[in-house]
Structures are given as structure tokens and as C-alpha cells.
From Swiss-Prot:
GO terms for molecular function: ATP binding; ATP hydrolysis activity; ATP-dependent DNA damage sensor activity; endonuclease activity; mismatched DNA binding; ribosomal large subunit binding; rRNA binding. InterPro entries: DNA_mismatch_repair_MutS_C, DNA_mismatch_repair_MutS_core, DNA_mismatch_repair_MutS_sf, MSSS, MutS, MutS2, P-loop_NTPase, Smr_dom. Endonuclease that is involved in the suppression of homologous recombination and thus may have a key role in the control of bacterial genetic diversity. The gene is mutS2. This is Endonuclease MutS2. Residues 707-782 form the Smr domain.
Amino acid sequence: MRQKTLDVLDFDKIKAQVENEAVSDLGRVKAAAMTPASDYETVVFQMNETDELSQIYNKHRLPSLSGLTEVKPLIHRAKIGSILNVRELNQIKRLIQVQNQYKTFYSQLLEEEEAINYPILDERMAQLPILTDLYQEIHQKCDAYDLFDDASHELQSIRSRIHSTSQRIKQNLDRIVKSQSNQKKLSDAIITVRNDRHVIPVKAEYRQDFNGIVHDQSSSGQTLYIEPSAVVEMNNKISRLRNDEKVEVERILSVLSGEVAAEADACLIAESVMGQIDFLTAKARYGQSIKGTKPEFTEERNVYLPKAFHPLLDRATVVANTIEFAEDIQTVIITGPNTGGKTVTLKTLGLIIVMAQSGLLIPALDGSKLSVFDNVYCDIGDEQSIEQSLSTFSSHMKNIVEILKHADHNSLILFDELGAGTDPSEGAALAMSILDHVQKLGSLVMATTHYPELKAYSYNREGVMNASVEFDVNILSPTYKLLMGVPGRSNAFEISSKLGLSGNIIREAKSLIGQDEQEINNMIASLETNAKKVEDQRIELDRLLREAKQVHGDLNKKYEQYQNYEKQLMDDAKVKANQRVKAATKEADDIIKDLRHMRDEKNAEVKEHELIEKRKHLDEQYEGTDIKQNVKKQKWDEIQAGDEVKVLTYGQKGEVLEILDDDEAVVQMGIIKMKLPIADLEKKKKAQEKPAKTVSRTNRSAVKMELDLRGYRYEEAITALDQYLDQAMLSNYENVYIIHGKGTGALQKAVQQHLKKHKNVASFRTGMPSEGGFGVTVAELK
């Protein structure tokens, strides 16, 4: 987009405000470089990216980005072998710290807001590298000012020796300065440092009383700073140790710089992502400051800005207006009084387009719709009049000529006072001709004018709409309200009357302009009133429609969640019911086999109370279980005496002995004879029965599907596990749950090692999170 357009629309002032919202140099650089895009995909992406972070910013307290600085030059120096100092290493450490804090914050955010998606920020966060090791290396070896003494054993040893030697020097010098005989010879009883050497201040006249080296003197020459001979060698030792310290510090910094170089690419990625995060946060803060909203971009041509206002004007006094190009409208012509807000309306439209295509939230109500323009062209300047020089008209015309050379169907053109600065009749003719030409190009145009001829222009052209800025004749002042679809009207008679002009003069003037002109003015006045009502109603309807869509979407989502939940419950219930039916059927079969075995045993004595007890046990296995719903029933009239049937309620085979009149039959099940409803019987083909073996059963209801071994010692746990697996096999369980807890993992390992060797275990696995996770092992039985 042309820089001239951005300058005219004051986009630099918007950029400066966004830049002020950034915390780091990285964010400020990106804000200063912000320019509008013209590619549809890019524009939509930038807006969505800003909107995602704005949603988070408006609901949460974001991690601090303070202290974030550009590290790219430091990374480059490290890569070529330069040694970074402690301050520079801390800049890299702060970058890593900031990115780690943001990753943690974002992870927690996603856990709290599972139903909300931030796809662009997801991708940004996924790009952030893992730099924990580099952070720890820097963090453990230095603070913000210097290396720690324990950054290496050698450095610790050197600094320890420096400290002990310094203490010895101070002890020696303390004895000298505190000696009674030396009190009058010293300028002050202190120990000081000159040229990195410990010295004492001696009066010049007592120089001969102190053996040593003079390192400095006072400005008056009356005090000499002498290093006594007794500490010269110790000071020399400290100098040597200081050199050793410098070498060791340089070595450590070199190692740390090498580690930075090894992670150079990762550090640059972190810098890029966190710089973008700061830039987006600045956009979000700015958007909140203007109560900005996210517009909807459409690929077809569309401009609808409900209650839009200029973001650089005082929010407390600025008048918001709805700006719209209806579906079939290509040109909007605004008429109205001077200083009535026409130029501000042009700039508002142009600036909002530029802001939106730069990824900034716009100063308008929710529901805005915008096209993406390749270019915005402006001819906006101070108001012109025919008294002004021809050079002013020429400069405007030169600008218009340049615009017409480059404009196309995907351009927005803003003309302020089109055709002004020359003879009114010629200016109006030029304006209409220019608008005709631009309409052929297909550009979207908004123009302001004083010429009354252009009011009629819209009625003679398709795709052209009138608009006007309102003037309040009661207070003789413009209201700055834009009325779309309503041409401006002359208020000369009303203004003159308010100012005290004679009514006779006004009536005579009205008679001179003709009845048609008066009727047109009256019609325009009526249109103004109706237009304001319609606009307010439309904005309210748009709001209600958005709310209805939001509610509809929420209800659809909740209904979908309910359906999924219901389906899950049904699926779980079916699985549990099938398992229960299968187990109950197996249990019943085994009980009947036991009864038959008791009957067939030569020496067995089957008493009536035992049969009743066994039958009661059989009934208990199926209490509350409705198997009939899951089995296809046989028609009643097909069952006859002598048929072999399956009793659906008990899942057992039997033989029909007799059909009764009241839809019941007498059925022999093994040694039990029962009267049952025919509807509970299913006809089976007769088959020779194999002799059954006696099986000792465990009452399944007494065996749980889980075994809790928490708190058991190893031997106790294995014994309990073996006993439980035997009982589970007899209960015909397919899967069982062994609860061993997490702890140290020793019990889990022991259980799984034992399950590997157990003859009745087909396989096993660690529990899912919903089953208890690592604290549970699920075993599948053979």
C-alpha cells in the first residue's frame, strides 16, 4: 500500500500507539515495521492471530515479558567464537525464562479451557524449543553481575586465596594504623586502595618513617599513599591471583558462550516467537483501549462498519457512525455543511481498512464486514474554494490523475471535495466525469462534495448512493452524524429564521425557488428522520441476530455433547449387560449340571430342601436381569408338548411336558419341573445330551472384578493374587483389575512379572487414565 496513503490517514500515529503498548524492543521493532497486507489469506491470518491473543488477554493475566531484549547479535558473536560477558549471558537466560513461563501458562490455560481452541497460538507454542539445560548452566554459574565463586573449583580456589591474602594484608596494616606511635603521622587511620594495592595515608613530613612504595599523593601534596614493605609481597601475590582469576573467568565464559552457540538456532526461534507474542500482546492492549472488535473478511466486495469512529479522536466526544456500501452500491457521495464531519468520515473509513489489513482490531461494533483491498487511494486535503489559487486545484488534479492511472476493481478511492478549487459548474462536471470513469474501473469510491449537482447524480446512475452529514438547525451546529441513503439539504431558510431574518423575506425567498424545490427539501427532511430510525433498528436487529446465532451454536454444541454422552452411556450399559448375561448364563449352566450330577450319582441322596435351595440360588443369579429383550422370541403356537426349548429367563434348556390353556406350559429342566409362560420359551432342535461333570462353583456375586493389593508385602501379594485369579476364573470373568498403587513401582513390577507366568492369564496391560493409570494392571483371563 502506498506510503502517501498511510501518511494522509495518520497510520504512523496508530503504529506509535501500538509500539507504546509493547514491553520489549522485539515487540516495538515489529510494531514500528507494521504495514497493511493485501493478500486475503495473510489478512485473515493476521486478524485471527490478534483475536486469539486478545481473547486470552481479556480473560487472563499474561506472564511478564519485561527484560526481553534482542539477542540475535549476541548469538551471532557466540557462533563466530566471541566470548559473551555475564550481562549478555543473562539476556539469553531471560529469553529462555520468558519462553518457559509462557509455555507453562499456555499449557495451564488449555487445561482450564478445554472447549476453546487457539490454533495459531498452538502452532507458535509448539515452535518454542526446549532450552532447559542452557538455562540451568547460565543460572548456576552467574547472577546478573558476576560469576559465582563456585562456577568452577579453580575459580573458587583462586577467590578463596585472594580473600585470605587480603585479610592478612588488612591485619598487617591494621596494626600500623592503630599503633599509638603512628597516630600523629597518618592523615587518617584508615586503609585504602590505590592502583589495586592496599595503602595507608601518611603525612608528607613523616615519609622517612615508613619503608615502602608511594603509589599516589593528595592534590595538596600533604598526604602520601604508601604501601608498607611488610605487605608488598602479599599485594604482589594478590595481583598474580587476580590475573589467574581473570583467565579462569574468561575460560568459564568461553564455555558458556560455546553452549549458547550450540543452541544458536533454537535461541533465534525463541526470540522470534516471543517477539511476535509481545507484538500481538501490544495489538491486544491497543484493541482493548479503543474497544476494538474483530471484523469478518469476505472475498466478495463488502463494507459494513456499524457505529465506527476515528480512533485518534477523543473517545468521549467523537460521534460514531455506521458506514456501509450496500451490495449493489459502488459509489457513495457525501454532502453537507462545512466542518460537518465529511472529511473525518473519509479518513475513518480509510484508516479502519488499513488497520484491519494490518491485523488490528477496529473501532466499530461487532458484526463488521470488510473486503480486502489491494490499495487505498486518497485525495484528502484542506477544504478548497474558488478564491484559492489555481496551483491548489492543479495539485489536487495531479494527485487524481496519478490515482486514476493505478486504480482497479480491487481499490478503495477516497475523494475529499472532488472538483473543488475551480468554477462550480466546471468543477461539478469534472467530478461527475471522474466518478463515471472510476465506476467503469470497478473501484469502490467515497467522495465528499459541496456541489448540489452531485445530489441528482446518484439518481441518474446505478450503483451510486447519496449520504449526508446532519446539521441541527436548533443549535445552528453540525451533529457529525452520517445519514446513509439521504442527500444533504439546504438549511438556509431555517438558519436565517433562527438568526432573526424577517418571516416575510423568508416566505418570498421560498416562493422564488419553486414548489418542487421546497417539496424536495421536505422529502429529504423526512428521509433523514426515517434513516436514523432504520439505522438504529438495523443495528439492534444485527445484535439480536448475533446473539441468536451464538445461542444456537451453544445449544447445538451442548446437544451434540449430550448425544455423545448418551451414546457412551448406552454403549457402556450394553457392554456391562452383555457381560452380566454371559456370566449369569454360565453360572446357571453349571448349577444345573451340579443338580443333574446329584440326581445321577448312585449313592447321592437329593432331598427336596436341597433342590429348593439350588433353585433359589439359580433365581438369585438372574434377579433383575431381563434377557428376554435381547433374544428373538419364538411364536407361541409353534411350541408343542415334547419340544426341546430354551427358557429365556434362566438361559437353560428344557423339555415341554404339557401346554396349558392359559398360555403357559409345564417344562422339565433337568430334575426341576416348572410352569412357565410360553412367551418365555424358545424352540430348539433336540440333541443328545452329553453327561455333565460336577463343577464346584464360586458364587460370582462374592467375587469382585478388582483386587486391591496396596499395603501388601511381596509374599502376601503373590499369594492373594493366585487365590483371586482362581476365583475369577471360576466366576468366568474376562478381565480383572489388580490395584497395586504407584509408589516406588516395586509392587507393580512384581505383579506383572507373576502375571507373565500365570497359566490362566492371556495378557495384561497398564490401566488407562480413567481406570487408574500406572496404579492399576488390567489382566485378561483365558
